[in-house]
Amino acid sequence: MDTLKPSDLTTELLNTGQSGVPLVICSEAPRVRKRIESAGYQEVKINKELSKRLLDIPKEDRPKLVEKALKGMLNYHVPIFVTDFEMLFDPRYEIDVLRFFCEKARIINVAIKWPGQFTDGKLTYATPEDPDYHEFDCNAYQIRIVQ
């Protein structure tokens, strides 16, 4: 895991590739989004489109087919900036969200807007009492945190 400041996030860095390492955006700085957009990243909002795709699948089959549907959705050949993906934390789906985006970053440049917190080398989503709660030890993943 590397940690970058928003000022480290240059257009050159974004355009030359991340060597298969996704950027995990934990910063709310407006310039981060502007730099990602100016580097040609396509914003992909997951929740609404994935929900539509899953409606065609019987409820009992969704957990085992959600990752396949997600891969079909993300069949891009340009860098992507992933937002609105909270539904991936649903415990029924059993998706390792960071692993999934690390695999995608081997094919194209990936930046994701983290919907939770980054503290003490850990990314979290929700609070421990929530059923959707997830905690990721960032040292277990090849990622770059922008905070």
Short names for language-model regions:
Residues 1-73, 122-130, 134, 142-147:
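Extended, compositionally biased accessory segments flanking or bridging domains
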Residues 20-24, 76-82, 108-112:
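Generic beta-sheet signal
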Residues 45-50, 84-85, 114-116:
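Short loop/turn segments at strand-loop or loop-helix junctions that form parts
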Residues 71-75, 102-103:
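Short, charge-rich binding segments
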Residues 75-93:
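Conserved P-loop NTPase "ATPase switch" module shared by AAA+ and STAND
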